[in-house]
From Swiss-Prot:
It comes from Streptomyces peucetius. Keywords: Antibiotic biosynthesis, DNA-binding, Transcription, Transcription regulation, Two-component regulatory system. Belongs to the AfsR/DnrI/RedD regulatory family. This is Regulatory protein DnrI. Residues 1-100 bind DNA. GO terms for molecular function: DNA binding. Disulfide bonds: none annotated. SMART domains: BTAD, Trans_reg_C. The lineage of its organism: Bacteria, Bacillati, Actinomycetota, Actinomycetes, Kitasatosporales.
């Protein structure tokens, strides 16, 4: 079974969809898939479905949702009874386990590629690192589990995945800056800073890319825009690192034009 969660939920076995259609069974399946190969306790499933106010019939209702998910698995397996499905979605002491190899999920593939990119970066293999980061990001088809109603537990996991995605994106930007690909990054960094108007790492990378592309005045304007946003929204000044970057650009510090450690180390922050 292949399960993809970095975008709309898609689960299939030999070309047959296993993705539940109804909202609650879809929610149950998603939480089990996020923890594939691990027992998810019944209280955790109830918490995801109903929060702190489960109905009196919560356990019976959960069992009904489990049965609905198993029916979908049965269809995909081409079986005429529930035996194989019960082996895939197993009842365990205190909970349920989706017995699917975690390597058959796009979440696992994303995290593996991101780790490979980090290791390549640490070895100085920047072309390989950039390629691995790109491959990891290419697995995303939209926001994680965008079509699944998320309770607290799925919501927390989605937030973790989205933060990891942003971290890998920062790492890829830094790697490409170190490879001298600043001009090609400008459209993407322009869009990213608009989407994340207070994210200092992205703004620093944008400023460096602009400066190295011969657009120094726009790099300084970017700093002014960031500062205005931070002051107006949070009442704080940009970090010392951003201010040092601005001063380096103002005095035409030759170090800012070289590929290397002058680029903000997003990879070490995002993937540590």
């Amino acid at each position: 079974m292949q399960i993809n969660m970095l975008g709309p939920l898609v689960a299939h076995h030999n070309g047959t969809s296993v993705t539940p259609i109804a909202r609650k069974p879809r929610q149950v399946f998603s939480l089990l898939a996020l923890q594939a190969g691990t027992v998810v306790p019944v209280p955790a499933l109830m918490d995801e479905l109903w929060g702190t106010q489960p109905p009196a019939s919560a356990l019976t209702t959960l069992q009904t949702y489990i049965l609905q998910v198993r029916r979908g698995i049965t269809v995909a397996l081409g079986a005429s009874h529930n035996g194989p499905a019960k082996d895939v979605l197993r009842t365990c002491y205190g909970g349920y386990l989706l017995d699917v190899d975690p390597t058959n999920t796009d979440v696992y593939a994303f995290e593996r590629l991101a780790e490979e990119g980090k290791r390549a970066c640490e070895r100085g293999e920047l072309d390989l690192a950039s390629a691995r980061f790109r491959q990891a990001l290419d697995l995303w088809r939209g926001d994680a589990l965008v079509d699944v109603h998320a309770g607290m537990r799925i919501g927390m996991e989605v937030a973790r995945l989205e933060e990891s995605r942003l971290g890998v994106l920062e790492a890829r930007m830094e790697t490409d800056l170190r490879l001298g690909r600043h001009a090609g990054l400008l459209p993407e960094l322009s869009a990213l800073t608009a989407r994340h108007p207070m994210h200092e790492n992205l703004w620093a990378q944008f400023m460096i890319a602009l400066h190295r592309s011969g657009r120094t005045s726009q790099a300084l304007e970017a700093f002014i825009k960031l500062r205005k946003t931070l002051v107006n929204e949070l009442g704080v000044e940009p970090s010392a690192r951003l201010q040092h970057l601005q001063h380096a650009i103002l005095r035409a510090d030759p170090g800012i034009d070289r590929n290397g450690p002058e680029v903000p180390a997003a990879a070490s922050v995002a993937l540590a």
